[in-house]
Design a protein with these regions (language model features):
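Conserved donor sugar-nucleotide recognition element shared by glycan-biosynthetic enzymes
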Residues: 8-11, 38-42
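Single-residue recognition of alpha-helix boundary sites
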Residues: 7-8, 109
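Alpha-helical cap/lid subdomain in secreted, periplasmic
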Residues: 14-21, 25, 30, 41-172
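Short glycine-rich His-centered loop
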Residues: 1-4
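Short, solvent-exposed turn/loop segments enriched in Gly/Ser/Thr/Pro and often Arg
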Residues: 33-35
C-alpha cells in the first residue's frame, strides 16, 4: 500500500509501467491496497472489488498486519482462503504472496504464520511467491526506520520478486 513512500514509486505503479511497455493496452491494474489493512478488512471489501473490476488475475498480498497484531493463524488462513475462493468463483487466477513476520514473535507463531501461505498455495493450487521481501532486508537503505516497510528504493526489487510468478499467469 506504499506505506511511508510516494504512491507513484510503489511496486504496483512500476508494474503498471512495465505492463504498458511490454504489452501496451492489454492489461489494466487496479490497486486496492490500503495501509494497515487486515485480512478481515480485505475480505469484507473483496466482493465489491471483484464486481467492479472483474479481474483475470487477483494478487493477494495480505496478512502482515494481522501477524504483527498477533491474530491467530487459523483466522488469517480462513480469511485468505475465503478471498481465494471468492476470486476463483469469478474465474480469476490467484497469485498468493507470502509474508514473514519478525522472529521476536516466537518460533511457534512465526512458523504457523508462514505455513498459512504455503498450505493455502498447495491446497488451492495457486501461483505462489513464498517471501515477497526476498533480498530486501539485506539491501542497503531498502527498509524504512520501522524495519517492517520497504523504502522507495526497494520497490523495483519487489516488482522483480513478484514478476516471474505474475508473468506465468499473464502468459496463460
Amino acid at each position: 500500500a506504499a506505506y511511508g513512500i510516494d504512491s507513484d514509486a510503489a511496486w504496483v505503479e512500476l508494474l503498471k509501467e512495465r505492463l504498458e511497455q511490454e504489452t501496451p493496452g492489454i492489461w489494466n491494474v487496479a490497486n486496492a491496497s490500503i495501509s494497515g489493512e487486515t485480512t478481515d478488512g480485505g475480505l469484507r471489501r473483496l466482493p465489491d472489488l471483484l464486481d467492479k473490476h472483474d479481474p483475470a488475475i487477483v494478487v493477494i498480498e495480505l496478512g502482515g498486519n494481522d501477524g504483527l497484531r498477533g491474530f491467530p493463524p487459523d483466522v488469517i488462513r480462513n480469511n485468505l482462503a475465503r478471498m481465494i475462493e471468492l476470486s476463483q468463483m469469478r474465474e480469476a487466477e490467484v497469485l498468493l504472496v507470502g509474508i514473514e513476520i519478525p522472529p521476536n514473535y516466537g518460533h511457534r507463531y512465526t512458523t504457523a504464520f508462514a505455513n498459512v501461505y504455503s498450505s493455502l498455495a498447495e491446497e488451492y493450487n495457486l501461483a505462489f511467491l513464498p517471501f515477497f521481501l526476498l533480498d530486501i532486508y539485506d539491501g542497503e537503505a531498502m527498509m524504512q526506520a520501522d524495519g517492517i516497510h520497504p523504502t522507495a528504493k526497494a520497490q523495483p526489487q519487489l516488482l522483480d520478486n513478484i514478476w516471474p510468478e505474475l508473468l506465468t499467469l499473464l502468459e496463460q
